[in-house]
Structures are given as C-alpha cells and as structure tokens.
Regions:
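Short hydrophobic beta-strand element within catalytic cores of glycosyltransferases
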Residues: 322-325
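A conserved catalytic-core segment of Leloir-type glycosyltransferases
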Residues: 36-101
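Carbohydrate-associated surface elements
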Residues: 171, 193
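Aromatic "clamp/platform" in nucleotide-sugar-dependent glycosyltransferases that forms part
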Residues: 305
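Conserved donor-binding/catalytic core segment of Leloir-type glycosyltransferases
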Residues: 216-233, 239-242
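Short alpha-helical donor nucleotide-sugar binding micro-motif in glycosyltransferases
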Residues: 284-285, 292-297
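Nucleotide-activated donor-binding/catalytic signature segment of Leloir-type glycosyltransferases, i.e.
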Residues: 265-285
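Conserved acidic donor-binding segment of nucleotide-sugar-dependent glycosyltransferases
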Residues: 337, 341-348, 357-362
Length: 397
C-alpha cells in the first residue's frame, strides 16, 4: 500500500510529530511505501521513508517557502508561533501551501490513501485531492477548535469527509463526537504506540547521567517530568508539590524538568520563589537523553490539567518508571495502581503525597518490572500498526 501522511509539525518536539515519525517507520518496515509531508525550519536527516518538508522561516533559516515560523496549538521547542496569532494573510498563505504541497505530492507519489494528523488543516488539504483519507485526532486540535473559530470551516469540512477518524483516548473520542458530530461507526479509538527499540530498561549510571546534565551531587531519589512548558502541562503544580516532598522527606530528592516552552522563565521564577534548591530545568532533551532520564528516575510525573493521551507516561513505564499523573484526559485509560497513581488536577498536596508513597514502597523493584511489562504488552507499535492497517483497509473498501 502507498500511504501519504501529512502533519502540522516537524517529526520531533511534539507528541504528534513523534507519532508521525514512528508510524511512517513502522509502516515502511512491514512493506508499505510511505511519504510524509510536514512543516520544518531546518534541514532534516534522512529516514527510511520519503519526506517532503515544507520550509518555514525559523530563527536561522535561509531557504524558506513561507515567511513565518510554523504555527502550533500551544508551543514547540522550535516555534512559539500559534495558529491564533496568524493574521488573515498568514492564515491564507498557510492553508494554501498545505493544500498545494498535498496536491502536488498526491499527483507525484500516487498514494492509495492519505493519513492526516489532527482535525485541522491537513484533512482539508487531503479532501482537496479527491483521494480516500483518514485522520487522527491528537487532542491539541480540539483545543484549537475551541479557541479560534476562523478555522472551523476547514476543520469541519476535512473531518466530515474523512472515511475514518482515529482518536487516541476515550476523552478525545467523546470531545471529537461533540465538536465535529462524527458518527460512531466512523470513529475508532487506537492508543498510541511507543518505540520499543528505544524506550526500554537500561543499566545506566545515575552519577554519569546526572553529570551529563551538569548535576554533580547524587540524590537518594529522582523525580522526572518531560513535556512542553505550557499551562496545560501543570508544571507549576509539580513545583508546588516539590516544595512539600522536599520538606517531608529526610532524604535528598532531585526533580528534573525536561522541556522548553513559553512558560520557561515564569516557571524558573516560581522555582526561585519556592526556594527549591534541588529542582533543575534541563531544557529540550533528545530521545536518547529522555530514555536515560526515565531510567534514573524513581517516579515520572504527568501533572497535566488536560492530557489528550500521555505518550510520555507510556515511554516512562517502558523504562520501568512508575508514573504519577492526573485523572483527566487519556491518563485514566491506562494508569492504574499497579504501575502508578492518579490524583486530582491542580492538587499539589495530593501529587506530593502520591509521589512520596511511590518512593517509600517496599515493592519498588517488582513495581518497576510490572511497569515495563505493562507498556510492552499493551502499547507496542506492533499492536498499533495492526489497528491502523485495519482502518486503512476499511477506508478503502
């Protein structure tokens, strides 16, 4: 099968970007021919699948096709431009280039099916080709739909003409039905898979990994967070929880926060205000560094106010790290008391208590083993690809 995949973001730095890259790799490895269209603002390394990056203007861009940085629903490590900031001309230019490149690549690549990421502009571009297409709803597109009505005609037209719509969690599925009025028999929940070759239990030196991050003192415990530094990610709640667990626990606890975003400076000021001496902002980390981070952590946290799915939680579990998250969005679909804990949103006291409970458990080794096995058995890309292939076939016949 020849599959053309379109996304709104680069193949790194966002959940949908990582999803798109992994999807393209996995489909290629089992014999499909794949090409991916995606925005970029710098050169990209070769992959095993074909690519057509659309070059946007970044901080260091020289050759670009469109004179502003690629827009996001929230933020991206390489762009703080949002869809909501685009003026009428920029919005028109964005839609035009997405449609034009999709039509050009459909003509050249001649795909059997198109897989659009997000119910936003890419499904609209896909329907312009007249080819069958499916779309995956990642959750941030739902935020965008609620926030900016200018995009409604495009998002709705693309959604309503899709042969099938994939949703990534129960909550995302419910909201997709409410906002886009897509029939039940067109929607299918397919949980995201993770890269089993990359995210796994490793025998690493805590001392060496910390030194790579510029931290020389080895603590008794490590708490990790990985994600965008945006309001919906709830990092401010984690910092307030850190104030509590640092005070209550006699042993030294280090909190490592990986990621960039619009709230970086604001969160650093909050850390200083709370006088957190053992909390470190690592900035953007690559996938290999993320694996190391999870492997040295005792607990990984996802304190989000809303989390469409929570791939970072799956990746942490795959590395044998229990996860403490919030009971909103996609996290309740898979976090249970055998591998972690769920707490109420914006409850720093409950978050701190859940983290402390994980740290003092007598069965931590068994719990880490369970976390890894749970991720492998339930969220491998092998399982995800089987579901996606089935949806492609349903959409074609």
């Amino acid at each position: 099968m020849k599959i053309l995949i379109i996304n709104h973001f680069p193949l790194e730095g966002s959940g949908s970007g990582v999803y798109t890259k992994n999807l393209a790799k996995e489909l290629t490895e089992i014999g499909h021919k794949v090409k991916v269209i995606f925005p970029e603002n710098r050169m990209v390394p070769l992959e095993i699948f074909k690519m057509r990056p659309i070059m946007f203007r970044g901080d260091n861009s020289k050759d670009y096709e469109i004179d502003f940085n690629f827009p996001c629903f929230t933020s991206h490590p390489r762009s703080n431009t949002t869809f909501y900031q685009l003026n009428k001309k920029q919005m028109r230019d964005y839609i035009d280039i997405m449609v034009r490149v999709t039509e050009e690549e459909a003509e050249k690549f001649k795909p059997d099916i198109i897989h659009a990421q997000h119910l936003w502009i890419t499904p609209y571009a896909a329907q312009k080709t007249g080819l069958p297409y499916v779309a995956t709803v990642h959750g941030t597109d739902l935020k965008g739909f609620k926030q900016d009505k200018r995009y409604h005609p495009y998002a709705l037209k693309g959604a309503q003409n899709a042969r099938r719509v994939i949703t990534i969690s129960k909550q995302v599925d419910r909201e997709t039905k409410e906002l886009y009025h897509i029939e039940d028999d067109k929607r299918k929940i397919v949980y995201n898979g993770y890269d089993t070759k990359l995210f796994k239990v490793k025998n690493v030196s805590r001392k060496e990994i910390l030194e790579k991050f510029g931290i020389n003192e080895i603590p008794a415990y490590i708490i990790s967070f990985a994600g965008k530094l945006a309001h919906f990610k709830g990092v401010d709640i984690l910092l307030k929880a850190a104030k509590i667990y640092e005070k209550q626990m006699k042993e030294k606890i280090t909190t490592l926060i990986a990621g960039n975003g619009v709230l970086y400076e604001e969160l650093k000021k909050l850390k200083d205000f709370l006088k957190l001496k053992r909390t470190f902002f690592l900035g953007h980390v690559n996938q290999d560094q993320l694996v190391d981070l999870y492997n040295i952590a005792d607990v990984s946290t996802v304190p989000s106010r809303s989390e469409p799915f929570g791939l970072v939680a799956i990746e942490a579990l795959a590395c044998g790290t229990p996860v403490v998250g919030t009971n909103q969005g996609g996290l309740p679909d898979f976090i249970n008391e055998d591998i972690g804990a769920l707490v109420n949103v914006e409850d720093d006291i409950a978050l701190a208590e859940a983290i402390i409970n994980e740290l003092i458990r007598p069965d931590k080794k068994e719990r880490r083993n369970r976390a890894h096995e749970y991720a492998v058995n339930n969220f491998s890309w092998e399982n995800t690809i089987k579901e996606v292939e089935k949806i492609y076939k349903e959409a074609l016949f």
